[in-house]
Amino acid sequence: GIISTAQIGFKEKDFYVNTLAANLRAIEKELKKARKIAPKGILGFNIMTALTNYKEQVLAAVKAGADIIISGAGLPVDLPAFVQGYKTKIAPIVSGKKSAQVILKYWDTRYKKTADLVVIEGPKAGGHLGFKKDELEKYGFGACKKDYSEEVLEIKKVVQEYENKYSKKIPIVLAGGITT
């Protein structure tokens, strides 16, 4: 299961006076709770790059033993550096071919690393996806579903380049906003 870190510490007593500390404590607590429920499950966090304390939250999740970090709401350019030396897998959230190309090339060039998983969120998912107005009009609610399906295939081609380069399978997860 995947746990969001957005204000994860809201139940902590000191949340309103020491929000960062409360959130960091809660990351470890929530992962421990999840491990009790699913001891053999794959457990991780969805951490938005737009968060003020993104790095601190990633490090807390990694040190707590997260199996995977999924990051979007911007490009997680430094995510490989934050998990270096740990077994935690990394997965960017992309919305189009361009964002997939940019993040995978950046990680390859800067860190000699690629994604362990790629998450695709379509234009109908809402949130922090980085679509331009013309793309929203092209792929949005009134648009033909076929158009974005073609974009998904283009993302898949980009991912395949890095599968070949790193001789590893990189699963693609369609997270939402593709057809609904």
Which residues does each predicted region cover?
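Active-site entrance/lid segments in N-terminal catalytic domains of soluble metabolic enzymes
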Residues: 1-166
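Glycine-rich beta-strand-to-loop/alpha-helix junction loops that act as flexible
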Residues: 171-179
